[in-house]
A protein has these predicted regions:
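Residue-level signal for the "D+5" position in two-component response regulator receiver
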Residues: 43, 69-72, 83-84
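Conserved acidic carboxylate
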Residues: 21
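Active-site residues of response regulator receiver
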Residues: 66
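Alpha4 helix (beta4-alpha4-beta5 surface) of REC/receiver domains from two-component response regulators
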Residues: 75-76, 80-83, 87-115, 120-129
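Acidic, metal-coordinating helix/loop segments flanking the phosphotransfer/catalytic sites
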Residues: 43-62, 82
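Disordered, acidic interdomain junction associated with two-component signaling
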Residues: 1-18, 104
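Acidic catalytic/metal-coordinating carboxylates
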Residues: 46-49, 70-77
Length: 133
């Protein structure tokens, strides 16, 4: 299976991911994975920084957001993002404690969730799957 995963196509030209994460170490890890896969990316340390990016003409094929952001949380950001860009795909990242708080109805269509700590392979698979969907 690992060999098959290596054969999956990398990013198409111009595909861009918005990373919204307040932990610089996680942001660096996610951006390194995206760079390795050939995706462009834009980073924001919190939701208030991300909103103007979402409102701009910046191409965004996927938003990866921590659920537990300072101020406005990732789910609230996704709601605003979808008001501006109705087809915005969102991959939430959450810690174990936060994952327990995620109830039914949290994820709308086009939204998925992975739990920290996550593997390079899981992040890679989710990003590819969601952008291709």
């Amino acid at each position: 299976v690992a060999a098959d995963a290596a054969l999956l196509p990398f990013a198409n030209a111009g595909e861009t991911v918005l990373i919204v994460e307040d932990d610089p170490a996680v942001r660096v890890l996610v951006s390194a994975v995206l760079k390795e896969l050939g995706y462009g990316f834009v980073e924001a340390g919190d939701a208030n920084t991300a909103v103007p990016i979402i409102e701009s003409d910046q191409r965004i094929d996927l938003m990866i957001s921590d659920v537990g952001l300072p101020g406005m949380n990732g789910r609230q950001l996704a709601e605003i993002g979808r008001q501006i860009r109705p087809d915005l795909k969102v991959l939430f990242i959450t810690g174990y404690a936060e994952h327990a708080a995620v109830r039914g109805g949290f994820l709308d269509p086009g939204m998925q969730l992975i739990t920290k700590p996550f593997t390079f392979d899981l992040l890679t698979a989710k990003v590819r799957e969601m952008i291709r969907a």
